[in-house]
């Protein structure tokens, strides 16, 4: 499975084409719109969330609610497009009807993108580099989540830190954490930390600044053996890290203990292996068990049967209402950077995008391992594989 996206932040729409989905997978606009709505939630979002009410249209590859096996086309329309008809027109006759943006923002793609592509109007860069692009990736992720669900795999996540305010680690089962996060404006399952996060966001907004944070994605039900150790580009942890790092403003990724593993001796890092055949009667996939999960469900580039746990660190959004110093590329004079409509804190939205890209990578890994042209064929291949693991 592979996909590409197209579209600009203030263009008419965002488009994705997904190739390689099996036939027979259930897809509905409602399942896509649910994830798009989650992306627009969260305390600290900007005014654009009041303008946009994202909806996904399915244009190809699906008939009567099920995939056909042909490419699937998804579209998320930009409802603010009417206000940008001439500024973002593809027609040459409208050239010059919008003032050029010549003051690049520190922390954005503006300056390096303009230099790379030879643009004197930074808008030609910022429109595509905007995190608005993640809306259609979330729609693709919703399709991938559907495949995971069809194969008895569950995915969710929580916000664990905002601007240095950290939630206490929860001992609750992951599904309960997800339910608590769903009831939180911060997607956080620590009520006390949520209050502190919101207070910090309010203060930060009042001084025209922004905040970043850390999100954690958790996945249950993954069979052992997704990914591979045999080549660098087949290692699932590497692919997950690349997917997460591709999200705008993500600057770091941890799997399991992550950087904490570097601070501990090996005896406090590696997960011991036990064998308990009674696990099979309890619905587990194999008789092998780990008393701990410091590896985060991945060893040697492959899933090991334990829950997948991966975190991503988001830097503060670089568009500030108290702008940093920049240079006008037309005059080379120092100026304050230009200001685009933006959020104070988009960490909850980043969690939804992180879940989406993790779901996409896992869907690709599942199709590589259990590949088939239809969902029924994939299920048969998976069941045969798991039957062999029960006696391993």
Swiss-Prot record:
Homotetramer. GO terms for cellular component: cytosol. NADP(+) binds at residues 39, 45. Pathway: Metabolic intermediate biosynthesis; chorismate biosynthesis; chorismate from D-erythrose 4-phosphate and phosphoenolpyruvate: step 7/7. Its EC number is 4.2.3.5. FMN binds at residues 128-130, 248-249, 300, 315-319, 341. HAMAP family: Chorismate_synth. This is Chorismate synthase. It comes from the Bacteria. Reduced FMN (FMNH(2)). It comes from Trichlorobacter lovleyi (strain ATCC BAA-1151 / DSM 17278 / SZ) (Geobacter lovleyi). This reaction introduces a second double bond into the aromatic ring system. GO terms for molecular function: chorismate synthase activity; FMN binding. Keywords: Amino-acid biosynthesis, Aromatic amino acid biosynthesis, FAD, Flavoprotein, FMN, Lyase, NADP. Belongs to the chorismate synthase family. Gene3D superfamilies: Chorismate synthase AroC. Coiled coil: none annotated. PANTHER family: CHORISMATE SYNTHASE (PTHR21085:SF0). It catalyses: 5-O-(1-carboxyvinyl)-3-phosphoshikimate = chorismate + phosphate. InterPro entries: Chorismate_synth, Chorismate_synth_AroC_sf, Chorismate_synthase_CS. GO terms for biological process: amino acid biosynthetic process; aromatic amino acid family biosynthetic process; chorismate biosynthetic process.
